[in-house]
Amino acid sequence: MRLCDRDIEIWLDEGRLDIAPRPPIERINGATVDVRLGNQFRVFRGHTAAYIDLSGPKDEVTAALDRVMSDEIQLVEGEAFFLHPGELALAVTLESVTLPDDLVGWLDGRSSLARLGLMVHVTAHRIDPGWQGRIVLEFYNSGKLPLALRPGMLIGALSFEPLSGPAARPYNRREDAKYRNQQGAVASRIDKD
């Protein structure tokens, strides 16, 4: 059963759930907390690689990822990031989220943005128990027009679901946690699998 707005407020007040900066009451709705777009992005740069063999030798996968992913792009206040039709880009939420070991989170995009063709997460919308950091957004523009995305705009909503008990292997205590405490638009670390 997912937390309702009253329970989200209680969990925030008690420090069991942390969202920084803490959202105002107007952004806690029914069963979700609205999150905003941060100012860090990462895109695929122009490349000549025919493909990336995701099951190939780790050093080859790492080299291929280094060739195709851009450095992190950091926007200054007032700037827009333009996501063109058919493009994939990574970004982060403005808010940093810390989940306890007995709570899982879910990220959903906004319906109003989806109706313009913007996918906020391509597949990864679960936020594991024990997570700490900013949430990476996997943007895809399936629409017909470029979309101007500005830091601070409402971009999605988080919901939270208590588990039957604390996780034995919460995310931030796992040795194989590839995105532990991420603060920026971290590129794929598939080569660390």
Curated annotation (Swiss-Prot):
Coiled coil location: none
Presence of keyword Nucleotidyltransferase: no
Ranges that cross the membrane: none
Gene3D superfamilies on file: 2.70.40.10
Region feature (Disordered): 169-193
Keywords linked to the UniProt accession: Hydrolase, Nucleotide metabolism, Nucleotide-binding
Amino acids binding dCTP: R110, S111, S112, L113, A114, R115, D128, V136, L137, E138, Y171, K178, Q182
Enzyme Commission number, as recorded: 3.5.4.13
A Pfam family this chain is assigned to: DCD
Recorded GO MF terms: dCTP deaminase activity; nucleotide binding
Single Gene Ontology BP annotation: dUMP biosynthetic process
Known catalytic reactions: dCTP + H2O + H(+) = dUTP + NH4(+)
InterPro entries: dCTP_deaminase, dUTPase-like_sf, dUTPase_trimeric
Active site: E138 (proton donor/acceptor)
Claim: Chaperone is one of the keywords in the record: no
Pathway(s): Pyrimidine metabolism; dUMP biosynthesis; dUMP from dCTP (dUTP route): step 1/2
CDD domains noted in UniProt: trimeric_dUTPase (cd07557)
Function per UniProt: Catalyzes the deamination of dCTP to dUTP.
NCBIfam families: dCTP_deam
Family note: Belongs to the dCTP deaminase family.
Quaternary structure note: Homotrimer.
The protein, known as: dCTP deaminase
